[in-house]
Regions:
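Divalent metal-cofactor coordination and adjacent catalytic microenvironments
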Residues: 1-207
Length: 207
């Protein structure tokens, strides 16, 4: 079952940053402000790469999602999660009372309630507006899991340390005549293995 999704309140660039500048500078043992602009740019790049790697929007946004012919569906699975709040539900053009549905936020499930019991949805058109995702570390009351934030810090630190290096060069040793080792392919935007490991539980798996 497919749906159409519209973002009604998008996260700003700053509210998409999955780690703080302070955390990155602490990781790199940098006290000066000389590199702040460059590091912030790397944070933006890492945040985008992590969202792409996880195949989901991580920052908190409010969206409107519409389904057609959901009769027999139990529960409705929202495209984004975790869900922090349901703004409203409209069933065949009629706003539903708040006591006729409930959400399982961590799973992104939306249940229809009849006399406080869970039942299958019966609707030709169902529209749900909800807020989903996490509040990032720079926001008040941040909710982003530490693993995601740590993955961003690791990626930024690795990219910063690797600046100026040949991305195709694995190692280079000088002992007598010297030696070099080259990798077959390289992607300067690739996330480090440690970051990928930290993110494994947050990746959306293909059906």
């Amino acid at each position: 079952m497919t749906s159409t999704l519209t973002v009604t309140s998008a996260a700003s660039l700053a509210n998409r940053r999955l780690c703080t500048l302070a955390a990155v500078k602490a990781e790199l043992n940098i006290a000066v402000t000389t590199y702040d602009t460059a590091l912030t740019a790397l944070i933006d790049s890492a945040s985008g790469a992590i969202a792409e790697h996880c195949k989901r929007t991580l920052a908190q946004e409010t969206v409107r999602e519409t389904w057609r012919d959901v009769s027999g569906v139990e529960p409705l699975i929202l495209t984004r999660w975790p869900v922090s709040s349901i703004v409203g539900v409209t069933v065949d053009g009629v706003a539903a009372d708040v006591d006729t549905y409930e959400a399982e936020g961590e799973k992104g499930f939306l249940w229809r309630l009849v006399d406080d019991a869970r039942r299958c949805w019966t609707a030709t058109k169902l529209v749900v507006e909800y807020t989903a995702g996490w509040r990032v570390p720079d926001q008040a009351d941040a909710t982003l899991p530490e693993g995601i934030s740590r993955a961003a810090v690791v990626a930024v630190a690795a990219w910063h340390k690797g600046k100026g290096r040949d991305p195709m060069l694995r190692s280079n040793a000088a002992d007598g005549i010297g030696s070099s080792s080259w990798i077959a392919t390289a992607d300067m935007g690739a996330l480090p293995p440690q970051s990928q490991s930290l993110l494994s539980k947050y990746v959306v798996r293909s059906a």
